[in-house]
Every structure is written in structure tokens, then in C-alpha cells.
């Protein structure tokens, strides 16, 4: 029978794709940050998405010489669409770059619509079997049918698949997707795959080891997945891959769900004057049973959805409760919000340094004039608490009592980027190497918000004062007070009131209230120009007849083939001119007038780590002011001396589908 029957379709809707992933960073070898090995690793991993998808789902290569040589491999599950494969490989590569900070080996098996694998090392592993590291994840649900019978069917299915995967005569070596029936309405779905650079013998060994892990990891569970560096094996009681829709399955040996109907021609039963055909009886009973079954299935679906919703809500409540601090504890930590504890002020309130449970923290006390309600405040806390990335400031907790709304963040000792960048006496502490590292770190942080986190998050207020610096001058993006969350099918939104900081906001946002991930890209471009020139984005270049803002000034220098005139004099003597020029080029691509012309953060990241990536010519930026007369300059001077204004209006947002 074909697997496109009614029950698997309902089961697929009920269960959906389970999100599984695993990763491992090596523990024996390490490289020096910003070394040639790190550069080679970034270049090679950035090349994998396009190469793997273009070569049928598998690609391996190496780059560099001697101890700086990096070997890498990427593989997608057989049959994956090229664009889906590319997205998964890109996600895996970025995952390794963000988590394996200085390890010379790394392995990631993420699932992003499909299952894929990326692996890198400082020694060649191509064509070699590596059984370790291995890890597994099992389904949380137990088997409810006969376990002995399940094991027998499962073992026969695994044996058959290994034979198919490693047979020299097989049409699809190194891969198998197959099914086996437990009952009329319960089917085991399984998939296994080796890296195709292995010998068939090594593939057989790898898969046998993975099958052998069943007793250890997943006995009695409805499903599981075993990852190894050279192969993967997964099974479930639901169709977790599109590959299963193309597989035919013979009817199970068990008794059918309904008894076989006897052959009835004109047989009838008489009672009084009523004559009832047995065929009519069956014609009534069978449809009734089917209808009842479907109704029960639909009710089960509704209960499942409500339970999932309840579980999600409960999880959020648990997270919120575990993060909540008592107001008295906050008062004590800040010496009753003493002026001497203030380390910053912003549009939403003041930031205090404090000590909670023996740990230094930054405590942000929102202004009582803030219109953000308690419910929205809690939602923001739950969302930010789930963000975990080395280039994002970590939220430790909150306090919500009466009119008090307080956020508790990790303490970042070196204050914010603007503290160093715009102070002539401190600019020298940021040499080009540090500035380039800050640009790279901000890129990774925004990429996580836009693409790699569970939700797509638009920051909407990227600026130098919202980039904090840790003890090693690594950047951490802060202040999510204006952030907006996009759903899976949302690519943009409109707002009737503007929130953000002048100079960093793109034209489509200021004029029409439209914002998207490309709004953050525009702000990022302005920020990069500030980092390079060491001056604020407000009007910085003045002559006897003209005043230009930063974007206009950078564009004019670019058009005049003199972009390096933009560079901060404190670093101009000791900077990599090619890197600086490339960063200016990328920044100008980010501030282009048309949002669709601006690159995505994943593309920007690739532009930064892969110098062979050809950059397109930038178009005229948004807010291009060619000449501002001398008569207007006095007013601009006063604006230049003032602090940048952040507009904190309440927003009314309409979302647009992709």
C-alpha cells in the first residue's frame, strides 16, 4: 500500500518535524585568535553552502599550508533541494564559527528543514572512518505497543537498510530510507546515511555501531537519532522526511483493522415484516466507525494543540518566575539607586551598577514615564532570556513591582563603544585590529537575531551606545527595548509611529514607517562608517561652503576614489588598507537607498570572512545630502554638539507576509 494513506497524514500533522541537532567542538587542539588558521577556517566554511548544494549534497576541500591548513566537509541528506541544502550548511557553518571559538576541530549536525552535517579539522579526515565523537537524542514518548514485537520489526528494518546502503549493487549507496509496519496504523520510519567518501566496508561498520547504540540510548522509546562523524541513523513513528512519501509498503501481517466481510449476495434475515440485508448492515456500520474514528482523531488534534499551547505558556511562566528579582534586593544592590552607582543614561531610563548574589550586574531602571505595559515588559523578558550568543548582552533577570520595571543584565566592564570611539583622548585604545574585531562581532550578533535564533528579531536601535565592550573589547549588542519579533512567514512590517535614533534610521522607515531586517542592515552600515572614521554619524565634515553628514561624506570620497580619507587619523598609519577599504565598501552597500539592494547579514558575514567574494558597486545611499549651505551651518553645529536623540514613541504595527 502507498504511504499516502489517511492516518500517516494526520499523524504527520499532529507530530510535525522534531527539531534535532548536535554539535561537538574538539578538546585537544586550539588555535590563536585572529591567526591564519582562523582566517582559513572562515574562508573554507563560507564556501561550503554553495559548493555542497551545487555538487549533489556532498563536498570536501582544504585550504592553507602546514599548521594553518584546514580541512572541511559538508553533507546534506540525500534528495534535499539545493536551496534548502545550502541554507542548512550555512547554518551549520555559522554555528561552528560561533561556538567553536578557538578549537581546531568541530562537528555540527543541525536540522534546518533537513538534516545536514559540517565538519572541519586541522588534519585530513577525508575517506577515513571516525566513530567518535558520537551522540544521540531520543524521542520523549515511550512505545505503547508490544515492545518485543517492536524490537523485532525494528531490528529487521535496520538490517535490511544497512544491507541496502552498503551493497555494491545498490542504486543508492551510502543512503537508505525505509519503513516497516507494526500494525495497520503504526509504521516505523527510518533513515540512514554515510559520508560518500567512505569505503562501503567503513560505512557498514559506522552504521552497525549506530544501530548497536539502540539498547544504550533509546530502548523503549518511539524514536531516536544517533550522530557520528561519518554517519547518521534516525527512526520515528512519524514520517520526518519527504523521502517516505515515495515508498510503498506491503500490508502488515497482523489482523486487519476490520473483519473481512463475507460474500453476501441476496442473504437476508427476517423478523416479522422487516427484512434487513447483511450488506446494508455492513454498509451502515463501516462508514459509522470511520466517521467516529475521524471525529476522535480531530478531537485528539485539538487537545494536542491546546496542551502544546499550555505547555509553551507554562514554560514561559517558569522562565519568567525564575528570572524575577525582589525590588528590595535591587534597591540593596544599587545602594537605593544611588547617583554614584549610575553608569549610563538612555531614552528609557538609567543604568546602575550593582552587586546581586556576589556578582556584578548592570541594572536598567526604566523610566516611570515609559508606556510599556507590564504584559509587554514580561513578554520582552521571556524573549530576551531565550537569546544566547556571545555577542549579545545576557539578561539575568527583572523586577516588576508597582510602577517599577527593572532589567538586570550581565555587567560589561568597558562601557559602550561610543565611550571610546567618539572621545579623542580614548580613540587610540581602539586600533584597527580591535575595530575590525568589533565589526565582525556585531555582524555575528545581528546574524543570530535575524537568522539563527528561534525567532526573527529586528533590533531597530543599533548604534554605538548600544554596543557594549567586555574586558577584551569584544562587542555585545544591548538594549532590546525597541526590538520587534517577526513570525516565520513575516518579512516586514509597518508602524504608524517612529522609534529609533536619528542618523541610524533608514529612509523607508522614517518616511513610510516600514521596517524589516534590512532596517538593521542600514543602521549597521552607519555604525561601520562610525567605527572606521571615529566620528559620530551626525554632520561631521564642514568646509567654507558645505556641510556633509557621515553617509554623504563617505559616498563622495568613494566616488572620488579616495575612501581612505575617511579613516580615523589615530589608526590611519597602522591599519590594513585593503580591509578598511573593503569595510567601507560593505558599509556603503548597507546604506543604499533601496532596501532590496542592501545585503542580508549572512551575505555581509560572508563578505567579511571571504576576501574572494566579489562586492557589487554601491548605489547612492539613503538620505543623500549633496550640499548644505553655509547659512544653515550654525543650526547644524548646535545639533552636532547635542546628544543623539532616541525617539521612544509607542508603535502600532501591521505585519506583512513574505
Curated annotation (Swiss-Prot):
It is an enzyme of class 2 (transferase). It is found in: Membrane. The keyword Kinase applies. CDD domains: Gnk2-like, STKc_IRAK. The chain crosses the membrane at residues 278-298. Keywords: ATP-binding, Glycoprotein, Kinase, Membrane, Nucleotide-binding, Phosphoprotein, Receptor, Repeat, Serine/threonine-protein kinase, Signal, Transferase, Transmembrane, Transmembrane helix. GO terms for cellular component: membrane. It is a single-pass membrane protein. ATP binds at residues 343-351, 364. InterPro entries: GNK2, GNK2_sf, Kinase-like_dom_sf, Prot_kinase_dom, Protein_kinase_ATP_BS, Ser/Thr_kinase_AS. Residues 23-277 are extracellular. Glycans are attached at residues 51, 60, 102, 122, 146. Its EC number is 2.7.11.-. The modification Phosphoserine is found at residue 465. The modification Phosphotyrosine is found at residues 409, 509. Residues 337-614 form the Protein kinase domain. It catalyses: L-seryl-[protein] + ATP = O-phospho-L-seryl-[protein] + ADP + H(+); L-threonyl-[protein] + ATP = O-phospho-L-threonyl-[protein] + ADP + H(+). The active site is at 461 (proton acceptor). Residues 23-125, 131-240 form the Gnk2-homologous domain. The modification Phosphothreonine is found at residue 501. Residues 299-658 are cytoplasmic. Belongs to the protein kinase superfamily. Ser/Thr protein kinase family. CRK subfamily. PANTHER family: CYSTEINE-RICH RECEPTOR-LIKE PROTEIN KINASE 14-RELATED, RECEPTOR-LIKE SERINE/THREONINE-PROTEIN KINASE SD1-8. This is Cysteine-rich receptor-like protein kinase 14. It comes from Arabidopsis thaliana. The gene is CRK14.
